[in-house]
Amino acid sequence: MLSKQIPLGIYEKALPAGECWLERLRLAKTLGFDFVEMSVDETDARLARLDWSREQRLALVSAVAETSVRVPSMCLSAHRRFPLGSEDDAVRAQGLEIMRKAIQFAQDVGIRVIQLAGYDVYYQQANDETRCRFRDGLKESVDMASRAQVTLAMEIMDYPLMNSISKALGYAHYLNNPWFQLYPDIGNLSAWDNDVQMELQAGIGHIVAVHVKDTKPGVFKNVPFGEGVVDFERCFETLKQSGYCGPYLIEMWSETAENPAAEVAKARDWVKARMASAGLVEAA
């Protein structure tokens, strides 16, 4: 029987770096998490995962089976380097090839959701043409995802093009495809001038997972929990009252910390206390 407990996961980059997924999932289990989100970022090392052999892919599947800690989602931020909106045809083609490989990888190892970075371009100047190319690239990507039965979910970003659920919903309506949904980050959403509760309510029915982190205006990473502007209890209450029952993912970048596990445990306890106050989980 499936548990009625709210699934709580941890981002791969919060845990010690390395390529042994069995060790990573064992640690996540020890820390009390239900799942780990994989990162495929713009570095060559993590991009290389998309070219894993059959044996390497099976090793991940085996690690999930052995630990019962799932890897249901992938944070695909590689499109910073190879954006779908690039005016360079070769760069854009590489971005689409990364998408194709990511979808195939997800299909092979059981990943259900690929979180997309909402950048038309990142290191270049955006314009009408980059936005048009981005839209067309999303359409092509969602067509591929549909055939593979893999969900593509747009993150709410640290970037004006996609800094609210309302903006992401515009793309959802444009694409009009059940395999394209939303994966909001309550930290990013709160760092902009958004009515956060209204935005969360507007996204219900399209939200497949939620990133949990703290932020400040203009500071989107490495803000310790409790030192930023996010009203966590209110966000959790709004999502609960709106009927959201999906997973929450603590997003951290503590893989290079002196003691990543201790940092993660501290953040886990802090977040779960706010979840308990909002009625999402039982108090410890």
UniProtKB/Swiss-Prot annotation:
Record-linked Pfam families: AP_endonuc_2 (PF01261)
GO biological process, one term: L-ascorbic acid catabolic process
Catalytic activity of the protein: L-ribulose 5-phosphate = L-xylulose 5-phosphate
Keywords on record: Isomerase
Enzyme class (EC, first level): isomerase
Induction summary: Induced by L-ascorbate. Repressed by UlaR.
Lineage top rank: taxon: Bacteria
Single annotated GO MF: L-ribulose-5-phosphate 3-epimerase activity
EC numbers: 5.1.3.22
InterPro entries: L-Ru-5P_3-Epase, L-Ru-5P_3-Epase_Enterobacteria, Sugar_Epim/Isomerase, Xyl_isomerase-like_sf, Xyl_isomerase-like_TIM-brl
Membership in a protein family: Belongs to the L-ribulose-5-phosphate 3-epimerase family.
General function of this protein: Catalyzes the isomerization of L-xylulose-5-phosphate to L-ribulose-5-phosphate. Is involved in the anaerobic L-ascorbate utilization.
UniProt-recorded name of the protein: L-ribulose-5-phosphate 3-epimerase UlaE
